[in-house]
Amino acid sequence: MSSEDLAEIPQLQKLSIPHGFQNKEAASSPTPSITLSQVPDLQPGSQLFTEIHLAKIEKMFEEDINSTGALGMDAFIKAMKKVLSSVSDEMLKELFLKVDSDCEGFVTWQKYVDYMMREFQGKEDMRKSQYRLHFYLPMTVVPL
């Protein structure tokens, strides 16, 4: 996924991605199954997707990183609670498990950003593939 592809996504035009979205492996992996509608603060245009909040989340990753360069589940939940205080621990645990798609037991800032980008790409692809049926009124019954 190139930066040109990302620029076409309206929800992501306000989103700046620190350190770039360069992970080709993540871009080619399958679209995740999470629905952002499950978490109120994870809606497009919500507080999670402002540059200020992304910067805060990145700072939390950098501050709370252990010697492996990643956050375990408890540290992830604690860090995310500082920024997304209205989200339940259960929802953050679910988010952690979905971001940690390779089941290593930890997430990095890059994995988090890659996950969010794939999620928005999947939502945008789904939105583009949907179409509306147009019914013309008055409707007529066509005998078979």
UniProtKB/Swiss-Prot annotation:
InterPro entries named among the record's database cross-references: EF-hand-dom_pair, EF_hand_dom, WD-EF-hand_domain
SUPFAM superfamilies referenced in this protein's UniProt entry, alphabetically: EF-hand
Domain of life: Eukaryota
Molecular function (Gene Ontology), one example: calcium ion binding
EF-hand domain boundaries: 52-86, 87-122
Keywords: Repeat
Protein name: EF-hand calcium-binding domain-containing protein 8
